[in-house]
A protein has these predicted regions:
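Amide-donor transfer/coupling interface in amidating biosynthetic enzymes
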Residues: 2-20, 24, 47-64, 91-211
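Short glycine-/acidic-enriched loop or helix-start segments at secondary-structure transitions
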Residues: 12, 32-35, 80-81, 161
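Short glycine-rich anion-binding loops that position phosphate/pyrophosphate groups of nucleotides
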Residues: 27-30
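Glycine/threonine-rich flexible loop motifs
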Residues: 32-49
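Conserved G/P- and acidic residue-centered "switch" motifs that form tight phosphate/ATP-binding loops
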Residues: 72
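Hydrophobic, aromatic-enriched interface-forming segments
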Residues: 75-77
Length: 211
């Protein structure tokens, strides 16, 4: 189900009850005021209505412990919603940064990332280093409380994070949807779907219990 950019309170409540998980995709830059910064000259225009919807949806789904997967902007949204900050433009703010803003085609590897030992992404991949694509000019700067790193680019840019106290809350900076045919990338979506199914089973079992 793809959500429209505007939902009233009743519609939001219905969506939260209907859906067992949420995927937050890539897109426009997040308004810097949401992480306590003024807009720099390099920050692209934001979409206030999208920010409003997605931050509200995230906080409510987080309270309900719904599974959530964030891709690119989605990782950045999770981080800022939980109290972290962002680099507004890597080339200007991180000397020596890789060129993270690749051109088409996106279904190819442009750099490697190192997966943190003991994290679920490392367990999924079964190896320390994997290749990824890269299509972003912003990135996590200060990681939010409650999130732990899962992957790093060679230049020190955070590439993935998760919340260990949640059933499934992963943020991925690259775009695994273009690399789905590789197990370590397609498996991210499979784990998310499996977590949503687990949540659905719990809901059904709870509703079946008398009283």
């Amino acid at each position: 189900m793809i959500l429209p950019p505007r939902l009233d309170e009743e519609e939001m409540a219905q969506i939260l009850n209907l859906c067992q998980g949420f995927l937050f995709p890539g897109g426009q830059d997040i308004e810097p005021a949401r992480y306590g910064m003024e807009r720099s000259a390099w920050c692209a225009p934001s979409l206030p209505q999208r920010d409003l919807l997605e931050f509200s949806l995230f906080h409510r789904a987080y309270q309900m412990e719904k599974p959530m997967l964030g891709i690119c902007r989605g990782l950045q949204l999770f981080n800022t919603a939980l109290g972290g900050t962002l680099y507004q433009h890597l080339p200007a703010e991180l000397p020596g940064a890789l060129d993270h803003d690749m051109t088409k085609p996106y279904d190819r590897v442009v750099h490697n990332v190192r997966l943190e030992k003991g994290t679920p992404l490392r367990q999924l991949a079964g190896q320390e280093v994997i290749g990824v694509n890269s299509y972003h000019h912003q990135a996590v700067h200060k990681l939010a409380p409650g999130l732990l790193p899962m992957a790093w680019a060679p230049d020190g840019v955070l590439e993935a994070a998760y919340a260990p106290d949640r059933q499934f809350l992963w943020g991925i900076q690259w775009h695994p949807e273009y690399l789905w045919h590789w197990a370590e990338h397609g498996g991210i979506f499979q784990m998310f779907v499996d977590s949503c199914r687990t949540t659905q089973v719990k809901v059904l079992l709870h509703s079946a219990v008398p009283g």
